Every structure is written in structure tokens, then in C-alpha cells.
């Protein structure tokens, strides 16, 4: 970092961050001797500073990556390189050498070579896959982008955990907690280029409707019988539950502008 930062005050602050002990859930403190804790707020910042040198190598107009017409997409220490498949093994070996020179190693479990026409690509919670579609006599390829099954499963698990054994909670409190969860998820995944977000939202609505029905039934109150007929729609109408289709449409339009 000293090669890229000249402000001694900032360097001192980063040094304190890196050497501060890590506090575990049980209250114990563990000394930090190397690296940054997983999920720490400073980790993405340090990754961006340190890997800026790698970005410059990849984007060098006269460099090996540019000559092979390879592009990079990077988020912190998680990156994709896209280009012609026949360059892939040569480029991968080159990346290994670059990382070694930087004192880093690639995660072999996460490092893969994929042909976009044959395999789905999973990145930052999204699934990218190549789809063939017929337009008249012609068959064209296009990229299908949608929230991955893993991302959807995580949302379902959080909803299940939220609604399980919460009989004592009021409807207003449940609506508030569910809205928090849905807004966070939709803010991330509602992007104009996500081609199948609406199909995903329909599935989420059905899942949420079923979970709300089970929760209301578990409370066993007569006052909830009418609400149980169409729990999702009724809670949207009478209790302010988020209309996820309407919200996603507004977010998609806002991000497209």
C-alpha cells in the first residue's frame, strides 16, 4: 500500500485496522496477524487499492490482455475475464504469474474456465447463460441474466426463519420485518438488464403467499381467516406489505436512466 498511498495518516489508520483484534460472537478476542477479516468493512477498500495494479496490467493498451481482446469485470477480489476461449489457458497461466509477483494466489476452487455457450456463469448472485431463440427463420443467441437459484434460496431461507415460530408477533411487525428483507433484496437484483426478474418475482410472490398463509394459520385467530384467503394481496392492500412487482418496476426504471 505504501507504493500507492503517500498519506502517512491514512497508512497509520489502515495499519491499526489490520492489526486490531477480531471479536468473536462469544466475546473472545483473537489477534490479527495477517490479512483482513472475512466480511470486514475495510476489506473491499483494501482489495480495490491493492488490485488497482492488476487492473492497469489488464487494461494496458499495449498489454497481452488487450491484444487478446480480453476484458475484465472486478468487484473487490472477485473478478471475471472475458475473451476468446482458445486464449483462456494461456491467459490463466499468465494471471497466476502476475498474482505470484503481487504476493497473492488464486482460489483454485473458485477459478474456472467456462465456455459461455455451454455453461452457466454465476457471479455476484446472478446467473448468466447463453440462450438460443428463433426469430422467423433465423436462430440467434442472447444472454439470459437472472438472480441465481442460490440467491433465491437464501431469500426463501430468511423468510422461513423470519416467519417460523413468530406467533406472538403482530401483523404490523411481521409486515415491517418482511418489507426490510424484500427491499434489500430487490434493491440489489432489480436491474434493467436482468431479463428474467419478473419470472423470479412471480415465484417469490407465490412463495411468500404460502409462508404468510402458514404463519397466519399458526396464530389460529378467527380475525385472520379472511386475510388467509389471499394473504399476500390482503397484506399489501390493508397493512402496507411491499408490492414487490411494483417496487421492482420502479427500481428497474430508475437504474435504467
Residue ranges and their predicted role:
Residues 204-207, 216-257:
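Extended C-terminal regions of large enzymes
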Amino acid at each position: 500500500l505504501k507504493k500507492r498511498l503517500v498519506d502517512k495518516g491514512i497508512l497509520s489508520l489502515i495499519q491499526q485496522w489490520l492489526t486490531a483484534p477480531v471479536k468473536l460472537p462469544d466475546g473472545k478476542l483473537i489477534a490479527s496477524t495477517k490479512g483482513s477479516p472475512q466480511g470486514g468493512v475495510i476489506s473491499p477498500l483494501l482489495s480495490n487499492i491493492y488490485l488497482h495494479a492488476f487492473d492497469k496490467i489488464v487494461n494496458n493498451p499495449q498489454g497481452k490482455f488487450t491484444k487478446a481482446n480480453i476484458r475484465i469485470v472486478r468487484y473487490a477480489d472477485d473478478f471475471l475475464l472475458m475473451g476468446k476461449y482458445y486464449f483462456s489457458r494461456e491467459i490463466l497461466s499468465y494471471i497466476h504469474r502476475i498474482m505470484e509477483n503481487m504476493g497473492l494466489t488464486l482460489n483454485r476452487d473458485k477459478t474456472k474456465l467456462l465456455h459461455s455457450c455451454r455453461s452457466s456463469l454465476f457471479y455476484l448472485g446472478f446467473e448468466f447463460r447463453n440462450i438460443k431463440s428463433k426469430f422467423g427463420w433465423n436462430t440467434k443467441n442472447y444472454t439470459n441474466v437472472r438472480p441465481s437459484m442460490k440467491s433465491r434460496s437464501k431469500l426463501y431461507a430468511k423468510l422461513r426463519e423470519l416467519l417460523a415460530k413468530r406467533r406472538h408477533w403482530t401483523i404490523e411487525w411481521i409486515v415491517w420485518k418482511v418489507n426490510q428483507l424484500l427491499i434489500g433484496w430487490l434493491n440489489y437484483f432489480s436491474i434493467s438488464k436482468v431479463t428474467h426478474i419478473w419470472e423470479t418475482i412471480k415465484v417469490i410472490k407465490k412463495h411468500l403467499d404460502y409462508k404468510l398463509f402458514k404463519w397466519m394459520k399458526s396464530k389460529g385467530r378467527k380475525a385472520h381467516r379472511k386475510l388467509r384467503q389471499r394473504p399476500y394481496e390482503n397484506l399489501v392492500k390493508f397493512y402496507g406489505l411491499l408490492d414487490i412487482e411494483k417496487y421492482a418496476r420502479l427500481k428497474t426504471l430508475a437504474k435504467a436512466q
